[in-house]
């Protein structure tokens, strides 16, 4: 996002986000309403600096692997996470954190004026959280966003108690919408949807260690809801292209243009343990990887915006054979 804002050629009409992406979304909205793109960039950096400060005190995992001078650093980081992960399988957050302490709660109140944010009219925000009782996704819009909504969107159930909002309890939105794409179809005018991936879609190697298996399972789980929505998009596009829909209904369907900023190569060396790391050196490394990836995407695909999809959803995400022509049955 920082690279897109620096570029200045892209106007962001809506952001659908979940989990850590929700922090980016609210920081963007808060900063943009006060100072435009540069204000948004400043707000993003300020918020993540506060996340880093909070993590220095409370993060269960340290990024030892950044110390390249010690060969065993990565192994120690994995061991630390493994011990912590085992702990969460024995005790729930209702047991080891009965007071429901979350360092993000106070940090959010210090960084963002939510009474002002709910009046943001420079971007449509869509924040996803998973309803624990129903298993359905709930999407919160600008006027509904509070610190509790942000905490719900990023609530990993192994770490934190479910967040109660309006009598319902919520976990991380990534389980059912990572992110949710449908609000962008229904509530925005733009045909272009740019998906920014933080989990690799594909990995060439078969995981064989316990840590690698857990890492890949985490990636597959959090990519599943997105892939289902992309399958639905591909189906509608196929119906439009093969003229299975009557002319009087075709105009009612938005022929969306899909773009994808994928960082499979840039992030392939980062496992699930790094999702709990928040020191500033590591966060700026992530930012720089993202900026480099976004810069390449802009150079290669900017001219596609407003004209055509820069990827073929069927070949980029779906299994081979899913793009076979539809056949009528009688």
Predicted regions and their residues:
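Short glycine-enriched, charge-decorated loop/helix-capping segments at active-site entrances
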Residues: 30, 210, 275-279
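C-terminal helical/tail subdomains of lipid-metabolizing enzymes
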Residues: 103, 108, 237-330
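Short connector loops/turns at beta-strand edges and beta->alpha or beta->beta junctions
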Residues: 20, 155-156, 199-201, 264-268
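Acidic, Ser/Thr-rich peripheral helices and adjacent loops at domain boundaries
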Residues: 207-238
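Active-site gating loop/helix substructures
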Residues: 85-191, 195-196, 202-215
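Hydrophobic/aromatic beta-strand patches that form the interior of the parallel beta-sheet core
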Residues: 16, 128, 194-196, 257-261
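Short active-site oxyanion
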Residues: 11-14, 168, 256
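Patatin-like phospholipase
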Residues: 1-102, 108, 142-152, 208, ...
């Amino acid at each position: 996002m920082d690279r897109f804002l620096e570029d200045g050629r892209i106007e962001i009409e809506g952001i659908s986000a979940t989990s850590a992406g929700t922090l980016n979304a609210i920081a963007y909205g808060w900063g943009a309403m006060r100072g435009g793109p540069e204000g948004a960039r400043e707000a993003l950096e300020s918020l993540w600096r506060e996340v880093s400060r909070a993590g220095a005190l409370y993060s269960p995992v340290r990024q030892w692997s950044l110390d390249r001078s010690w060969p065993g650093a990565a192994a120690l980081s994995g061991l630390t996470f493994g011990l912590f992960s085992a702990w969460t399988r024995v005790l729930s957050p209702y047991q080891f954190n009965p007071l429901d302490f979350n360092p993000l709660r106070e940090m959010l109140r210090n960084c963002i004026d939510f009474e002002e944010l709910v009046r943001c009219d420079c971007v449509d925000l869509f924040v996803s959280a998973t309803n624990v009782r129903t298993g359905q996704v709930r999407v919160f819009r600008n006027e509904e966003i509070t610190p509790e909504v942000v905490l719900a969107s990023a609530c990993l159930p192994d770490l934190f108690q479910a967040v109660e909002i309006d009598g319902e309890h919520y976990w991380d939105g990534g389980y059912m919408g990572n992110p949710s794409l449908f609000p962008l179809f229904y509530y925005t005018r733009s045909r272009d949807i740019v998906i920014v991936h933080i989990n690799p879609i594909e990995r060439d190697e078969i995981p064989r260690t316990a840590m690698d298996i857990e890492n890949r399972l985490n990636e597959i789980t959090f990519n599943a809801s997105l892939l289902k929505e992309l399958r639905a998009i591909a189906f509608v596009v196929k119906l439009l292209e093969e003229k299975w829909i009557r002319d009087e209904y075709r105009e009612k369907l938005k022929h969306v243009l899909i773009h994808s900023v994928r960082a499979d190569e840039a992030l392939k060396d980062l496992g699930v343990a790094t999702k709990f790391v928040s020191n500033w050196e590591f966060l700026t490394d992530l930012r720089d990887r993202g900026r480099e990836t976004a810069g390449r995407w802009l150079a290669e695909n900017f001219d596609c915006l407003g004209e055509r999809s820069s990827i073929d959803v069927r070949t980029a995400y779906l299994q081979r054979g899913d793009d076979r022509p539809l056949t009528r049955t009688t």
